[in-house]
Amino acid sequence: MKKRLLMGLLVLLSSVTNVANAALELIITDGIDSARPIAIVPFKWQGTKALPVDISSVVASDLQRSGKFSPVPTSKMPQTPYNESEINFDAWTNLGVDTLLTGSVTQNEKGEYVINYQLVDVVRGQLTSGQSRALEDGQLVLSKDHVLFNKVATITAPRMREYAHRISDLIYEQLTGERGAFLTRIAYVVVNDKDKFPYQLRVADYDGFNERLVLRSKQPLMSPAWSPDGRQLAYVSFQNGQAEIFVLNIYTGEHEKLTSFPRHNGAPRFSPDGKKLAIVLSKTGSLQIYTLDLQTRQLTQITRDRSNNTEPFWHPDGKSLIFTSDRGGKPQIYRVNLSDGSTSRLTWQGSQNLGGQITPDGRFLIMVNRSDSGFNLAKQDLETGAVQVLTKTLLDESPSIAPNGGMVIYSSIYDKKNVLSMVSIDGRFKARLPATNGRVRAPAWSPFL
């Protein structure tokens, strides 16, 4: 059933079109009160032309967005050391900084960029004056145990921003023990009524850079969802006059229609192992949740009642689904065990709760919570039931969690149009990614790539 998109639905093949370097502009809307101070010193550049990317700026922005770190502004840095031997440890500890990144960039004869960088424990360096010694083969040698890592990489200009995100991931993991999610992407739908193809599915780096158009249509596109390997997107298209579910290979442009049952086909979501899709169909009347085996095409009905059941999301262990249902009168979030069909209600605080997702560690439920203040993102501890409202934006919807569980991207209203917003999982850091050429909806954060 594989075929190329026709007429009104165009896939941009092999070399996907670069829409803009940063069509989504990230704007910080709320700072961090108690995040860990860190110094990301501007890298020394030993060249004649400007660097293609300011590596230290990308790294500092990444770490700030995590909500866990507060990079020292360059204007407040007491010095700009380019390697660990130049660090004045007392000057940095007086600022409350316990960790510092320093580095330099040179260019080799091939035109490639050689990046040397070090992450330094400033407090340890202060204690030892950077001159600690350790016994090695019966000899006392300089250990430099204040250097947490010392790395060298050779890259080309087009990969420089990508590698800056890689450095951010390394720092994040070194200091938190958790994997960083800065080398990831987001997919989203842009709607521009003035465009010949007003509905566009785009993919960008998580921070909005390197945006690329992968699909465009004259009819609505909805609900993009990543496969676990990051190579495919499931989505809903109205190209043929009704909602149908497709899957698209974002590298080859191949797409395949998966379901076209009467009435509604929607809300696709890949299982953690990538072998199944959870979907919503209304072929028997009300909205019901099914799973579709992607190899055998076997369809299994999960919910069976007269209420509307939608927005399925897989528990990380793949053994249950959470979903939104109006079986109690108003939308609330429930959990169904796939082995025996037993169902339990998860949400009780707020008049409505919908759009639920579970963090990768299984600890928290992220959802859209309706209260007297409107529709806002909230986090519920699945063990204690405690609920924390994370946002104060307007008409929040479609939350999507980073693969490490540290951030959430979602759609909200700003300046009377849909934009993408971002909030750290603890609610301390908030940012907005407004599009310059349309309304942006239905974000989906990729898996680790």
Swiss-Prot record:
InterPro entries: 6-blade_b-propeller_TolB-like, PD40, Tol-Pal_TolB, TolB_N. Residues 1-22 form the signal peptide. One of its GO terms (cellular component) is periplasmic space. It comes from the Bacteria. The keyword Signal applies. Disulfide bonds: none annotated. It is found in: Periplasm. The Tol-Pal system is composed of five core proteins: the inner membrane proteins TolA, TolQ and TolR, the periplasmic protein TolB and the outer membrane protein Pal. They form a network linking the inner and outer membranes and the peptidoglycan layer. Part of the Tol-Pal system, which plays a role in outer membrane invagination during cell division and is important for maintaining outer membrane integrity. Belongs to the TolB family. This is Tol-Pal system protein TolB. It comes from Vibrio vulnificus (strain YJ016). The lineage of its organism: Bacteria, Pseudomonadati, Pseudomonadota, Gammaproteobacteria, Vibrionales. The gene is tolB.
